[in-house]
Amino acid sequence: MIKNTIKKLIEHSIYTTFKLLSKLPNKNLIYFESFHGKQYSDNPKALYEYLTEHSDAQLIWGVKKGYEHIFQQHNVPYVTKFSMKWFLAMPRAKAWMINTRTPDWLYKSPRTTYLQTWHGTPLKKIGLDISNVKMLGTNTQNYQDGFKKESQRWDYLVSPNPYSTSIFQNAFHVSRDKILETGYPRNDKLSHKRNDTEYINGIKTRLNIPLDKKVIMYAPTWRDDEAIREGSYQFNVNFDIEALRQALDDDYVILLRMHYLVVTRIDEHDDFVKDVSDYEDISDLYLISDALVTDYSSVMFDFGVLKRPQIFYAYDLDKYGDELRGFYMDYKKELPGPIVENQTALIDALKQIDETANEYIEARTVFYQKFCSLEDGQASQRICQTIFK
């Protein structure tokens, strides 16, 4: 009771401080934040890099305490969240470019343009479309009310395709005129670098991946009912890594990429398995991967830009589809690759990856046309020209 009261008082004081400081606007300042200040990544990063080349504005990142080293390594200007410099930056900024929800106790001035980039094409139900929220620390009503409050503050919401646009309007309670249907800025790199052998080999070299090996990335999503604490989830790899190693020859390297909400990390197995969950730019990992193994993650849509083979390891399909989230699309009919539901089927699909690639050429093309047709490498430009016209 006392703890909750103190929390509310702190939130109210932050709201009041933001409101006061917003009366001293900095019309040349743009504020960026990715995954709650833990990463230099995703759509905000792509927009930041575009603006460094095409704008004279002052660009600043908001960073969670403990993650400053990431931005120091890249020589990127930042302020630590809840520091004095942060209080003097975020509420006064001309624009916010953020890819996740922000607390409603962060006051946003009408003079600040809030661009919500979001972070994926939705396969699983999101926002107000989740009829039974099973996330730790909230319930269905509070979760949905929070989304409504948040989306009312957005001036623009980025959509990667028409499919997402139609979903976002209801799931986020946002009007069509606020949605910028442009493609995703983070996918500009995929269009620009997909055939750049020197760039791709450079990434492999940094990760100590032999240039002659096939790279398979496993990138599953998180499960709502596997929370360790509020906002943090565990994930158990549902296959035997040693069995996979024995079944595949020495020509393969497996990359494990966990969702940003998953705190579980996997032990690496010699040079066969590499945990790349902390590698900041997943676009680089797409570029070096010959194939993707996922489940219900939106990575399938980004990887679809490259039209490379995908395998869908959906070992808990019925539970996930019926009990946890539910899907917007027909999961069993619209995917650009085979669904496998156990370890044996997964290994067989990986061993026959070339045959699978040929079998699903048409499916990948149809998938690309529906979800990736806007990804022409110019999304960042389109967004910035609209916001700062």
UniProtKB/Swiss-Prot annotation:
Chief localisation class: membrane
Example of a GO cellular component annotation carried by this entry: plasma membrane
Catalytic activity: 4-O-[(2R)-glycerylphospho]-N-acetyl-beta-D-mannosaminyl-(1->4)-N-acetyl-alpha-D-glucosaminyl di-trans,octa-cis-undecaprenyl diphosphate + CDP-glycerol = 4-O-[di(2R)-glycerylphospho]-N-acetyl-beta-D-mannosaminyl-(1->4)-N-acetyl-alpha-D-glucosaminyl di-trans,octa-cis-undecaprenyl diphosphate + CMP + H(+)
Subcellular location as annotated: Cell membrane
Pathway of action: Cell wall biogenesis; poly(ribitol phosphate) teichoic acid biosynthesis
One GO biological process term: teichoic acid biosynthetic process
Bilayer topology annotation: Peripheral membrane protein
GO molecular function, one term: CDP-glycerol glycerophosphotransferase activity
Enzyme Commission identifier(s): 2.7.8.45
PANTHER family found in the cross-reference section: TEICHOIC ACID GLYCEROL-PHOSPHATE PRIMASE (PTHR37316), TEICHOIC ACID GLYCEROL-PHOSPHATE TRANSFERASE (PTHR37316:SF3)
Function per UniProt: Catalyzes the addition of a second glycerol phosphate unit from CDP-glycerol to the prenolpyrophosphate-linked disaccharide, to complete the linkage unit.
Name under which the protein is recorded: Teichoic acid glycerol-phosphate transferase
Lineage: Bacteria, Bacillati, Bacillota, Bacilli, Bacillales
